[in-house]
Amino acid sequence: LKAQLLQSQVLHADESPITILGHKGDKKRGYIWAYASGVHEPIAAVVYQIKEGRSGQHARDFLQHAPPRPNVDKTDHGPPGIKRWSGHLVVDDYAGYKALFVPSPGVGIDLSIIEVGCWAHVRRKFFELHVAAKSALAEVALARIGALYEVGRDSRAEGLDLAQALLRRQQESKPRLLG
């Protein structure tokens, strides 16, 4: 399933804390890492990994060995036939992901991973601000993000293919965000 997921050009990644139980009943903090395909990918899949830490190295390791994708140029820097995943990675602002978006020092490798911010995480921060402080600015931001979400809902409701949905998003997103 991981090999199929890594054929995607768009992936979503996120990590959430969990409690890991040891053999003697001891408890440790761990994280469940989720990697999901984008909504327009040919496969709808999620791969979960449970790790004892939150280090961004876990995401780097997951993306390290991707099978070749047809018609997609990738940087080869592993064993023959093994290539690092490249594409658009949708993540929150957790610092652990940042190393994925820059070349490795001293190696000169272009990782070809493009950071895509997650609107759900942005929206949650404005929602928390609105609840805590009844912020008028947060209320405006929530309304504009909601209008942005409508672009995607409308595209799915109309059954637009990826190219059509992308064109709509490019045409309608900025005006909706700017109000």
Q: What function would you assign to each model-found segment?
A:
Residues 1-179:
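Catalytic center-proximal scaffold of phosphoryl-transfer enzymes
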